[in-house]
Amino acid sequence: DHKGQVMADFVVLKEDNEFFIIIQKDFISIFTGELEIFAKFGSVSFDVCDHKIIGEINKKGDSDNFYYSNDEFELNLHLKKLNYKNKNSINLDMWNAANKILGILHLNKSDSGKFRPLEINFDKQRVSFEKGCFRGQEIVARMKYLGIDRRKFCTFIVQNFLLSIPKYF
């Protein structure tokens, strides 16, 4: 939004000559509401599609078109027809865990408008400071170049047990 808050998270996917926005159903109205005022200037329309979204986790270098990566893995998305059957799959919980391990936070509807991109790692690969412009860019850029990181989304992998915390904490 104009204050630099993240309203929704999504992935832009280009297949052939069409662009698709991969977004949770809860965010569709928020997303279109924020962008409809700009869409009319470019003769752009938003249509809801009912494709299957297939996510892939590949070793680094094995994917042509990935949306996020680290030193070892790449995450990739594809759109398929509804009757597509995937034979080599993981469940949604495993996919979400892979995203969290890579430091990707997927927002819930209740998170809309609570965070700026730098607070949830969107400055790493989701917000470009080199090109384009977006609503709230001045605030976000000022935080990036002049501010101090006060909050950051971090992923910790721990064993499933409780630690004994000393009383002085």
State what each model feature region is:
Residues D1-F169:
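Basic, glycine/lysine-rich polyanion-binding surfaces/domains
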